[in-house]
């Protein structure tokens, strides 16, 4: 029997905009299985990134239910949700989201320290080595290329040994060569941790690597396809 890692039931999201409350996602029903790699695709503004943020508890659903690993994220308080996300998920963003005043090593180690891991810096060093950046450990983000910054972000996402990996346009700001390297590392981290991977992408080649692709349009699921059909 396949275990569900992520489950959304009639999930909705509304956000405040200049013209008042705007509904971003409408009645999303979606289940992601353990070990599955799911791609979210669709035109700009279709709700892909918002759906990913909902799955990770980075946005709170304004309707319906969002569950991860059997836990109802919609019923958690802010502190409980932050702890749960920190312990179970790794998130990679298009714009890296590194702290500019911290070195590469500190960017990876600090979340582990905050989670109470006494071996935070040893684990961070191992993760930087795994992404080929141990020689840049003492450099600050401004001293790193875009590809190197995304490698730091991948190391940070991998460090807590997540059960769920979420990636929002992980190759969006990179050239083709760096993008291919990041994809290889991302899928390697998925395999290393036996994690479920959900990613947002505009890249057809990256979408074809996913087990299943869900296409969004105007905040709704328009269609979905398994890998064979997507190809």
What are these regions (language model features)?
Residues 1-14, 223-231:
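ABC-family P-loop ATPase nucleotide-binding domain
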Residues 4-6, 11-209, 213-216:
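ABC family nucleotide-binding domain
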Residues 80, 220, 228:
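Residue-level detector of flexible, active-site-proximal loop/helix-junction positions
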Residues 213-225:
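H-loop (His-switch) and adjacent beta-strand-loop-beta switch element
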